[in-house]
């Protein structure tokens, strides 16, 4: 049995057509089904529907053989035991700092609100900047508006939400897209099967971008 961990939303919607190229199609619509384990048209392949931030954990610990996760999630994840063999070039966005429009750069210790705590620590450590990291799980844009933080670090797509709240994107930390991740033990035990799937997905990605 080959188990693939996916999260609902944009990643799932963009991944399913790629899996279809490999003949893997869910037998019911994951967006409408309440099931968290979805069979596919291949009897020995199933999908696990999990939270986006949990995909690397399921794969690392062998509960799933493969998964699809955003590079932002993988950058924040501190575990081991994952291969990242393929950039699927889907769900593309940017991980950026943002602050109030026209605000001067704060002097001294910086307060940064984000859910990407590990990313923030590494980013500012590389700059030699002293920061206080404030972990939030959502509505990041509020933090600078009410004086909770000087800046935020968040995923930015169009930037419209930032601008609607009086903020502007500032420093680019990373360009984000979704990646295929594979459990290291699964790669050894089911190498031929998984490598064939990787090769098929790679061709599908290349074909999509040529077209």
UniProtKB/Swiss-Prot annotation:
Main location group: cytoplasm
Function: Catalyzes the condensation of ATP and 5-phosphoribose 1-diphosphate to form N'-(5'-phosphoribosyl)-ATP (PR-ATP). Has a crucial role in the pathway because the rate of histidine biosynthesis seems to be controlled primarily by regulation of HisG enzymatic activity.
Annotated catalysed reactions: 1-(5-phospho-beta-D-ribosyl)-ATP + diphosphate = 5-phospho-alpha-D-ribose 1-diphosphate + ATP
Listed name of the protein: ATP phosphoribosyltransferase
Domain characteristics, as noted in the entry: Lacks the C-terminal regulatory region which is replaced by HisZ.
Signal peptide span: none
Keyword set includes ATP-binding: yes
GO molecular function: ATP binding; ATP phosphoribosyltransferase activity
InterPro entries for the chain: ATP_PRibTrfase_cat, ATP_PRibTrfase_CS, ATP_PRibTrfase_HisG, ATP_PRibTrfase_HisG_short
PROSITE patterns reported for this sequence: ATP_P_PHORIBOSYLTR
Record's keyword annotation contains ATP-binding: yes
UniProt-listed NCBIfam families: hisG (TIGR00070)
Species in which this protein is naturally found: Pseudomonas fluorescens (strain ATCC BAA-477 / NRRL B-23932 / Pf-5)
Protein encoded by which gene: hisG
A single Gene Ontology CC term: cytoplasm
Keyword terms of this UniProt record: Amino-acid biosynthesis, ATP-binding, Cytoplasm, Glycosyltransferase, Histidine biosynthesis, Nucleotide-binding, Transferase
Subunit structure: Heteromultimer composed of HisG and HisZ subunits.
Enzyme Commission (EC) number: 2.4.2.17
GO-annotated biological processes: L-histidine biosynthetic process
Pathway: Amino-acid biosynthesis; L-histidine biosynthesis; L-histidine from 5-phospho-alpha-D-ribose 1-diphosphate: step 1/9
A Pfam family reported for this protein in Swiss-Prot or TrEMBL: HisG
Family per similarity comment: Belongs to the ATP phosphoribosyltransferase family. Short subfamily.
Highest taxon of the lineage: Bacteria
Subcellular location: Cytoplasm
Uppermost EC category: transferase
